[in-house]
């Protein structure tokens, strides 16, 4: 399954917030997001994201790409995974046919097409790092 197909599958958000902020919110979310993406908060956020991915790496084979899937690094070492998180990251779990995307300009990561077991594991890993996993309306 390629990236385009996976991006069309059901997805969940791995986030600092437990659910989607209402659209009618008066802009506080964007002010909070801007603060979280600034130094020094962005380093703490990056560490949480990396922790989830490194722990997931202990359980699953991973492939990573920072060029929208043009090239893949199979079984990256932890340092490569850490460095890749500083770019637009595509993390493929080939044994699950699942994909995680992460962008340094976002406070969340997105998990596409997880099996029930993978979703349960990611929930546990994220919770341990103070993150939430929730599913937005699909469509």
Region spans (language model):
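Structured alpha/beta or helical-core interaction and ligand-binding surfaces enriched in interleaved
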Residues: 1-109, 113-139
């Amino acid at each position: 399954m390629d990236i385009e197909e996976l991006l069309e599958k059901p997805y969940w958000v791995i986030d600092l917030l437990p659910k989607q902020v209402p659209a009618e919110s008066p802009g506080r979310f964007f002010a909070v997001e801007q603060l979280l993406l600034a130094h020094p908060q962005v380093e703490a956020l990056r560490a949480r994201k990396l922790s989830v991915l490194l722990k997931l790496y202990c359980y699953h084979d991973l492939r990573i790409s920072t060029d929208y899937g043009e090239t893949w690094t199979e079984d990256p070492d932890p340092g490569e995974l850490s460095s890749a998180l500083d770019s637009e990251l595509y993390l493929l779990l080939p044994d699950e046919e699942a994909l995680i995307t992460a962008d340094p300009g976002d406070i969340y990561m997105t998990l596409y097409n997880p099996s029930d077991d993978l979703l349960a594991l990611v929930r546990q890993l994220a919770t341990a790092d103070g993150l939430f996993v929730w599913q937005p309306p699909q469509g």
